[in-house]
Amino acid sequence: MMDNMQTEAQPTRTRILNAAREIFSENGFHSASMKAICKSCAISPGTLYHHFISKEALIQAIILQDQERALARFREPIEGIHFVDYMVESIVSLTHEAFGQRALVVEIMAEGMRNPQVAAMLKNKHMTITEFVAQRMRDAQQKGEISPDINTAMTSRLLLDLTYGVLADIEAEDLAREASFAQGLRAMIGGILTAS
């Protein structure tokens, strides 16, 4: 019986999260209502609150989904490609994400500036991601791809900040079509990571 309940609950939870993503990215966090989310995914308020007790709980789930997507890039050692090239490709790939998804990331970051609860969620997300990026940087140091003198913890955070800057740039997708975009990223990231 429990397996059947979990199977039924997952699609509802996913529908709620998808609706929340869309509504938050279109209307902003404060203008979005739980009622609009219910209407968008055709569920009752009771069903919504069964899965998520507040907007902050929805944001937490979205943050964790986004964190998992980021970790998928850095969880395993990077093989067959230089670390700098991997970072450039990863950042360029973000410019192809749906504009609504990119807007949602910026909206959540802005909410983190106002709301200490969301700020704590983002801090945890950033710490988790940068720990994995720092590990991949240490791997690259061992291979001699980047300078052994780099502070991997701080540099991984700066690379994350660069990534968020690209996500927030409304022209990033158009700019990324130009070869000079990847070339500039490669020069910037390579300069930081290979400087002695």
From Swiss-Prot:
UniProt cross-references to SUPFAM superfamilies, sorted A to Z: Homeodomain-like, Tetracyclin repressor-like, C-terminal domain
PROSITE patterns per the UniProt record, alphabetical: HTH_TETR_1, HTH_TETR_2
Keyword Zinc: no
Pfam families recorded: TetR_N
Keyword field contains Repressor: yes
GO biological process, one term: regulation of DNA-templated transcription
The entry's DNA-binding region: 33-52
One GO molecular-function entry: DNA-binding transcription factor activity
Keywords: DNA-binding, Repressor, Transcription, Transcription regulation
Domain HTH tetR-type: residue ranges: 10-70
Top-rank taxon: Bacteria
Function: Repressor for the uidRABC (gusRABC) operon.
Name of the protein described by the UniProt record: HTH-type transcriptional regulator UidR
Organism whose genome encodes this protein: Escherichia coli (strain K12)
